[in-house]
């Protein structure tokens, strides 16, 4: 499986094999596309109980959905995790998959933009949920609209499609 470079990404977008909505050409880099942070977040409630890690445990039962007004920020305290979501909806056609990765400029501040599960399978058509955690020593102000992460595209041997639980997640269903 090979990683798509800028020209291959642009060609796949032009041919409809990759769809990014909204699409901002300036966010296409040499081997990835930057994705920006939406203004909707899920903040974990402070609980003093054990959370069972099971297939049917739903993060929505443990979080409150908030909207950050334009020009404002969400504050992520050291050791805290909040859920964010990309503004862009990403669709991958057959034969493509990819990886959601953080950006080193923010990692150096202690911000991890996804805890686990960076792989995105072929056929996804969704906004990407970000498990954002502050591993640094100080609170972090994070602003909606910032290019928070990047998506690296790969060619896939085969034409399989991902049809799992989060295949078509949006800001509304998040």
List each model region and its residues.
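DUTPase catalytic domain/fold
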Residues: 1-174
């Amino acid at each position: 499986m090979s990683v798509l470079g800028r020209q291959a990404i642009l060609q796949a977008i032009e041919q409809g094999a990759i769809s990014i909505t909204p699409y901002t050409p300036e966010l296409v880099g040499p081997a990835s596309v930057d994705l920006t942070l939406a203004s909707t977040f899920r903040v974990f409630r402070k609980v003093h109980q054990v959370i069972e890690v099971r297939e049917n445990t739903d993060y929505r039962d443990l979080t409150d959905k908030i909207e950050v007004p334009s020009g404002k920020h969400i504050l992520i305290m050291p050791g805290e995790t909040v859920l964010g979501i990309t503004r862009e909806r990403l669709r991958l056609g057959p034969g493509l998959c990819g990886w959601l990765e953080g950006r080193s400029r923010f990692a150096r501040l202690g911000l991890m933009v996804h805890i686990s599960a960076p792989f995105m399978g072929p056929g996804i058509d969704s906004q990407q949920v970000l498990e954002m955690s502050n591993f640094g020593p100080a609170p972090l102000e994070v602003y909606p609209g910032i290019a928070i992460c990047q998506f690296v595209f790969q060619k896939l041997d085969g034409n399989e499609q991902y049809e799992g639980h989060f295949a078509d997640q949006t800001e509304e269903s998040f």
